[in-house]
């Protein structure tokens, strides 16, 4: 390659690696000017990120949020296209946050971004591991590879030669892959902490949990003292999310009393066990659960809070891990009374083929559970309408898979589609039909 006259050309072995080094330099290393809190795990990243941000704001700090739903600077919302933006967009966003005097950034960090080096130039101060369950195996191939990818974050937060002190790592010790994250932490650099709902020796231990359809209450032991927590987040899985957020906040110097008070005023995250209320007698929930573990967690939560039947509307995305399709079918069938299999984001695949692969798992369980009602409705709007029409009294309808998303990706186009909007329309139409 011949350079134009007067233009300096630098030849490198790896252009991506060079960009990872150059871009933070160009933006004057913005992550060094703020406290960087990273949240990683298969499920719970988004909720935990927003809870940490809320706690810090209640403590008087200005926060930035980067994640699946959006990026936030205070209350100002900015669109994002990936859970973790590419290196240029990320560093530009961090620079903007630093310019606007953000003190703490709460950031979801995906396994893809860690492997691909998107966060290579970011100096993290505080890292939280939520859990690791089957997902993204089309990319990572094995769970061990997936775990190693997540562990890169804990190597980063405790790596030598960083510009800031007070490094911390918080790990959900109840997860089978917790040891992978813990082993990655250099405890000479970062403080390693654990949280749990089953291990009393963990640094944060939650117990005596009680649930309603709209809230949770539980106690936490920390440094020998017991604290009472109340939150509007429903379900056992949200106690885990809250514990991770509590840990991160403690490492930022926030008192337990301030954290507990903040949790009372935290509202749900869009599309995360979001209640849809149009005055109906039954409960309707929209949730982003799109992994086997995520689906199982919202279904077990439904069992804890529901006296009536569980109706679940769900599917699997196209051009993604095909192995999880029958698994999710089996999980839905195991916990639900009515399983409605439908389309998610089919992308370039045939929606009917995807639905058949998911339904195969449902049928396996139905052979042993004849009471299970199974409906296959490829059109997602019709599937939601079907669930609403079948529900009554103390039932709960779970609409899983898309959560906050307001689009559906088809083979040749992307259309507007929001589960929450569709649920509200179906509820209003159902109410009108009954009266």
Q: Which residues does each predicted region cover?
A:
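N-terminal leader/targeting and accessory segments in enzymes
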Residues: 1-21, 207, 230, 234, ...
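Short loop/edge segments at beta-strand edges and connector loops
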Residues: 13, 67, 109, 173, ...
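Acidic, Mg2+-coordinating active-site environments of NTP-dependent enzymes
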Residues: 2-6, 126-284, 362-368, 372-375
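Short, active-site-adjacent cap segments at secondary-structure transitions
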Residues: 3, 71-73, 113-115, 176-180, ...
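A short, gly/pro- and small-residue-rich
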Residues: 6-17, 125-130, 148-151, 192-194, ...
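Phosphate-binding loop of NTP-binding sites
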Residues: 18-171, 179-189, 243, 305-306, ...
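ATP-dependent carboxylate-amine ligase
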Residues: 247-257, 261-271, 275-435
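Short, ordered loop/turn segments at secondary-structure junctions
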Residues: 1-2, 68-69, 111, 132, ...
